[in-house]
Amino acid sequence: MSAPRRAVVTGLGVVAPHGIGAETFWKTAVDGTSSLARIDREGCGHLPLKIAGQVPDFDPAALIEDTYLVQTDRFTHFAMAATQLALDDARLSRADIDSPYSVGVVTAAGSGGGEFGQRELQKLWGQGSKYVGPYQSIAWFYAASTGQISIRGGFKGPCGVVAADEAGGLDALAHAALAVRRGTATVVAGATEAPLAPYSMVCQLGYPELSRSADPGRAYRPFTSAACGFVPAEGGAMFVLEEEGAARERGADARATVAGHAATFTGASRWEESRAGLAHAIGTALARAGCRPQDVDVVFADALGVPEADRAEALALADALGPHARRVPVTAPKAGIGRAFCAAAVLDVATALLAMEHELIPPTPHVLDVCHDLDLVVGRARPARPRTALVLSRGLMGNNSALVLRRGAAPFPE
């Protein structure tokens, strides 16, 4: 009987408030530096949301052809730029692809193309329907990034979009890994968001979990007694997943293995109930990865920044990991960039991958007084040799997801 196919990460591309490219992103994350700042987008000044994680110095025209720019929103610009970075990192060119049907694309998105949509709606109401551009019909849609990435790359394998709230980013990677295990050679997967246009910001005002603080140093402090919610962010990450044997044959480095995943649903803003749902997802993901609780070397927490939600997450870790929950390092680097909705967890996956490679666990910015029974990494990066990382994500609408990464193509624990 042949060994089961395994999906490994061979390429990583990041566009985030910490910067563009994995190296720049990692340097800022490991230093514990915060990229949160007052929102400087035109039209947002009167809104009660004051702080966000904004991608600096992003020039889509320098990274994406004009043909695609006129058809797409900022969230798709992020996705296309991050995809090219990931393909370059994987050293995967068109010449390396045997058939266009051997490459698929899976993304997740929550906010869609709000910036493009707002611009066209303003034309509709200010000038009339004949001034609305034809690309409004596709640019706002959640599937736009998957479609444009596949068209640009000529990828004709299985493509899809995951709609699973903030947990969608992890679920997209799991969906991609499943496609690889079922026979697809390569899948480009990840998530990006651009939720900071005025229209998008107004749509978020109904979330009670959002922080209204106007102080970048106090607006997002998960797992503390002063936690007052989270701040939004833009950006995201894309990955190249390949079948392990095929990656090895072409000389690609297996940076990590997508070892296990599970998802549950516990209802919108039901944070006490999320404890059981998240614990079940953790236990199932570990079982599917062939890991025991004590095999987990680092946890990248969901870290919502809402007291009830943080408490539920800490208790879920205790339920799923037992005594090991008090010993395993836990971190939430997203406190320095904000929560990019569907893309928040894939940025955590990027950080986890880099943490395993650099043997450093980045700290949780803005946090000093941890009020939960966790070994939360704060202040400065912690030297470690993590081989197994657990990444967690929960959505405001009730989705819970857990993903297990193993360093390189290392065999699973016995």
From Swiss-Prot:
One GO MF term: 3-oxoacyl-[acyl-carrier-protein] synthase activity
Superkingdom, natural source: Bacteria
SUPFAM superfamilies according to UniProt: Thiolase-like
Domain Ketosynthase family 3 (KS3): 4-407
Entry-linked InterPro entries: Beta-ketoacyl_synthase (IPR000794), Ketoacyl_synth_C (IPR014031), Ketoacyl_synth_N (IPR014030), PKS_Beta-ketoAc_synthase_dom (IPR020841), Thiolase-like (IPR016039)
SMART domains xref list: PKS_KS
Natural source organism: Streptomyces halstedii
UniProt-recorded name of the protein: Putative polyketide beta-ketoacyl synthase 2
A single GO BP: fatty acid biosynthetic process
Family the entry assigns: Belongs to the thiolase-like superfamily. Beta-ketoacyl-ACP synthases family.
Keywords: Acyltransferase, Transferase
PROSITE patterns: KS3_2
Enzyme Commission number(s): 2.3.1.-
Role according to the record: Involved in developmentally regulated synthesis of a compound biosynthetically related to polyketide antibiotics which is essential for spore color in Streptomyces halstedii.
GN (gene name): sch2
Note: This putative ketoacyl synthase lacks the active site cysteine.
Gene3D superfamilies (alphabetical): 3.40.47.10
One Pfam family matching this protein: Ketoacyl-synt_C
